[in-house]
Structure formats: C-alpha cells, structure tokens
Amino acid sequence: RYPFACIYGIGNALLIKNLAKHYKHLFVFESEIELFILALSTIDLSEELKVYKVVLFDCVAKDLEIQIAMIFDQQSILEYLSLYEMFISSHYYLKYYETSILSLNELCIKSASVAIRNADITCFLPLLTHGQFLQNIPSMLESIPFQRILNERKNKFENAIVVSAGPSLAKQLSLLKAYQDKAVIFCADGALSMLEKEGIVPDYVTNLDFTDLAMKFFQNKENLKQSIIALECATHPNIVRSLNAENCMIVLRNKALYQRFNLNDFGYIDTGTHVSHFSYTLALALGFKNIIMIGQDLAFDEEGNSHSKGFDFGEKFSGEENIDKLKVPAYAGKGEVLTHITWNDYRIKLEYLFACNDQKAKFYNATEGGARINFTEELSFKECCEKLLTKEKPKFELPKSLTKNRSDKLLVKFKEKIQKDQENAKRFLDDALALKQILENILSKDFLLPLEFLEKVYQNLENFNHSLDEDEFIQDEVLRGAFAYRGKMIADVLKLHIQDKTHFITAYIKAYHEWLLYFMEKLEQKYKSLSKV
C-alpha cells in the first residue's frame, strides 16, 4: 500500500526488480558506483529506470542533498513523506556501510522536514498571496512587461552584483561605491537604505513581501527614477500602489498558478521565497555570466546581529529572534555560525538554484562572512572587483508599458478566466459536500458495513481524488499544502498496517472525511478570493 520505498544498497538488483512490481517508486541509494554497474549488467532495469519506477542515487555525489530535495518536493512523494523509512537490502551493507547509512538517513529526514515545512499544510500563505496576486493584476498590466526588459537588456553585459542586507554588507559598501559603474547592481529592498546613504544607485531593486512592512524601504523612491523596481506579482498590494510608477515591473512567477492566465508579456521567473533569490534569478534571466554576492550571510554575526548596520528595522531585527536556531559551516570553512531554520531553508534553495545554473553563470560568494553556500566560489569582494569589473556598464532607457488598449483586452480575458474558475470551484464544493454527506452517513452507523459496499465507496473516493489531481485549477499549487495534509491523513492509516480490508477501508473513510472538511474550508477561501475580482 506504500507508494514508495527507500532502499540502501542495490545488491544484485534482483530484489529491486521484484519490488518494483509493487511500488510506484523505488529510490535506491548506493555508495559504490561499481556495484551499480555490476548489478545493472546482471539484471535489466532499463524499463523501470525509464519510467522512474526505480531511481538510483549515488551517495557520494556532491549534489546528493539537492537530488533528494528535488524528489521529495514532487507532489506524489511529498504527500506521503511521513511514511519515509530507509530499508537496507542486505546484511552486507549494514556490516560495511553502517556509518554511510546513518548519515544518509539523517540527510533524508532533514530533506523531508524541509519539504513538509515548505508545503505549509495551513495553506495560509498561498491563499493570502493568491488573493494579493488577483488584486495586483490591473497594476501589473500597466507596469513594464518583463519580456520587454529581456528583449532590450538580455546578454548586454556580463557582470552583476547581488546585494543582500546581511551583517557583512557594511564592510563592502565603500568598494561597491567605487565600482558601481562597472557592475549591474541588483539590490534586495532591505539593503536599499544602506546603498542610498553611500550614494549608490542600484540598477534593479527586488521585492516580494507579502506584508506591507517593506514600504519603509522605499521612503526615498524619487532617488530610484532610473532604477527598475521589480515586484513579485503577489507582493502586498499596498506596496504595489505606493510604487505604481513608470519604472515599476511586476513579474509573474514560473508556477502553474500564474502561467495558466496566458499573461506571457509579464512572465515568467522563479522568484523563490526570499528576496535575494529573486535577484539571482533576475540576473540569470538577463544573461549575466558572473554573479557576485555580498551581504548574503544567512546567519547571525558574532554580536548576534541579523542585519547590516543601517537596516531600517534595526541590526537585531525582532522577526528573527523566535525561530529555531542551528549551527552550520561558516564562510571559508572557518568553524560554524549560528543560523535559524528559515535562513537554512533559503540556503538549501539557493544551492539548488546555483547547482542547476552552473553552466549559465559563475557564482562568486564575496560576503566574507556568514554561512558557507555550496556551489559558489568564495572570493573576497576586492579580488572579485579587480578580477572581473574592468568595463563600464551600459546605460538603458526605461522600457514602455503596454498600450491602454492592449492592457484592457488582457484584463477582459483575465476576468473571463476568473469567471470560469469560480464556476469550477463551485462545482467541486458541491461535489465535496455531497461526498461529505455520504461519508457522514456511513460513519454514523454503529456496525460494520458489508465489504462489497465499502469497496464501492472507496472507489468513489479514488475517483474524486483523480478528478482533483487532474484539474488545472485545483492543482495550481494554492492548495498544495491541503494535498500534503491529505497524504499525511492517509499515511497515518497506512502506518497502522490493518490487514482486514473492511477495517482498513473504514479507517480510510474516517481519515478521508476529516481531510474533506479541511479541504472544503480551504477551497471556500480560494473561492471567496475569486469572487472579489
């Protein structure tokens, strides 16, 4: 009944071949690449590998953590991560690879925790940002289209500096000022005031805040008339309204939720979940080959500061104090530094981003402090400037927005799509309500119902699941956390290992009913957001 299993050791691959018949996915980990080769030369797994029924992992690969994170983030796996367990294929592996197995198991548990945490089963943030995205559409259609920026500026210069607001930033500002004409500067909104005090004008300022606290960063927006202010499409509407100017660009994320509206002029980019991630992906989209990062500490400094001197909310920002802490390797391998789980999640996401784009650009970590970030070259900011920044950067005019006629037509099409989504949401709510009433009728009985009847009910639940899983509106990721919760509820039943089918289906129905109530509540919230458009 488990949808996947993790196994350490390929052995002679016969066990893997036989198990593959019973699982949707088998994840096989091996520390000796020669054993992979030997096993695959004995047993043909080509068909299983081709359709990802069997996935092989090299335990000594540098990017193993990233590979695991990618798999665990897949919706079909994410839902059932609470079932994770590392099985060992034979006593041989336990005898000779126990240390490797324990280390791998710890890594998998950590990756599963990050994936589950990111899924956000409360759906609070996805529902909030979905509503804000809908409110921002009219402003976005009047802003600079992202595709015009790409058409006019892509591959025109090689060197970029991404500025973050970590504690190490202050010591880099004098050098940044000296070289500001020789690099295109991407500035996280939180670092803006520090640059302003030094007379440094960034080329791009990025923002993706779901609250309006960031309005404080833009108090001197008149200094940014030649800068592009890049806002993520779901940033707080108050920020969008306060910055609604000819140099604003509101960008759509490269997610199904935003792509399904076909507003292609304004997308698409992986803005990530923190502002500097947005800066890096914007620099990559514009074709920069050398991306230098400063102020990217992702850790507290020795005085316990979370941000650089001059940060608008103080060097010890209260928002960072109550998050669970941990120690991680420090920049340049100099011991360890204190961070918290949110920064650490950001670091893992950045490492994934850098590893995936190492053929497009070279990433230089010139922070000279904070946490070590893998898949970057650690080099002092001075060395980066002297080595790379030898040419003046080009000057550009601000691109124009769309004509009013074109933006009005796009708005009409957008509203038509929203109308269809409303109808779809209402249909699913009605179906869910009918199903809820059936399940409550079954659960109200004080005796076990016949197995044949229960099997029909179980099949109806599977059919409803299938309709949910195949619908583009339902699967636009706003309710991703709700489906992670569905998986957890079902996994809790599977972990009971109920052998009797009647008792198993009854337990399944009880769990599904509890989830269905939760799902209806979240879908109702999404429906209300659509109704406000």
Predicted region positions:
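Glycine-rich phosphate/ribose-binding loops and adjacent secondary-structure elements
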Residues: L169-V184, A188-N247, V251-R253, Y268-I269, ...
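Short, basic, glycine/proline-bearing loop/turn elements
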Residues: Y2-F4, E158-V162, P202-Y204, L257-Y268, ...
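Phosphate-binding loop/pocket of nucleotide- and phosphate-handling active sites
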Residues: N305-L353
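N-terminal donor/sugar-recognition subdomains of glycan-related enzymes
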Residues: R1-A160, P167-A183, S193-M194, L213-F217, ...
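Structural motif
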Residues: C6-G9, A160-S164, I185-C187, T206, ...
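Active-site/ligand-binding-proximal alpha/beta "capping" segment
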Residues: P237-L298
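Glycine-rich phosphate/pyrophosphate-binding loops
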Residues: E30-S31, L192, G199-D209, A283-G310
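Short acidic, glycine/serine/threonine-rich loops at helix termini
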Residues: L40-S41, S174, K197-I200, N207, ...
